[in-house]
Amino acid sequence: MLNQPPFLLSVYDYTGNWARPYIDAGWRVLLWDQHFEGSILEGFGRLVSLVEEENEGRVDGLLAAPPCTAFAASGARWWQYKDSPGSAEPPWESFTEQMVGLTLIVWEMVVRFRPRFWALENPVGRIEKLCPELKPFRRMSFNPCDYGDPYIKKTILWGDFNPNLPRNPVRPVEGSKMHRLPAGRRRSELRSVTPSGFARAFYKANHDLSINFASGRQLELFAS
């Protein structure tokens, strides 16, 4: 599509924080989240049709922040329940299986849309064990205080992108504030908000489409 701004797909980015710098820079951005879609499987089908019809199947960048509630090490004491049959609505047998399914949808998007760059984030935990497809693509880890937000929450990124983000380290004077959030329905949403400093740094390192982000691993993936 000639003379169109670049197109970014931001998945499970409920607040739009990670995509915000791209929006501000004039990129065309589509936010896609299970909170919007109802049935996530039907929603994925609609998304594929939308991208293929409206943007000729082209995706320049893909960002993904799958729900971490079955993966994060901070919630390990609940894994046994989340792994148990009956802990999710059909067609899923367990809550963990459902969360793995949401993550593998991102993998399917990468294979189908072949973005110029892509990144998936999750806190320290077991996502790589349950979704081994990600393992060859682990690129970096960070804490929000590395990029200007004064708290800690170690997060890992997988994908093919430029990991040389411009740092802006500050003292983590707010500590591990995410662990202190009150219990309630919004706790997981608040914990999943992408730190704004990291989002800006990621954009600065990953907006120039003249750079070839694709590694040998990704080229092998696309050739398969």
Please tell me what each predicted stretch does.
Residues 1-224:
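Conserved active-site and SAM-binding loop architecture
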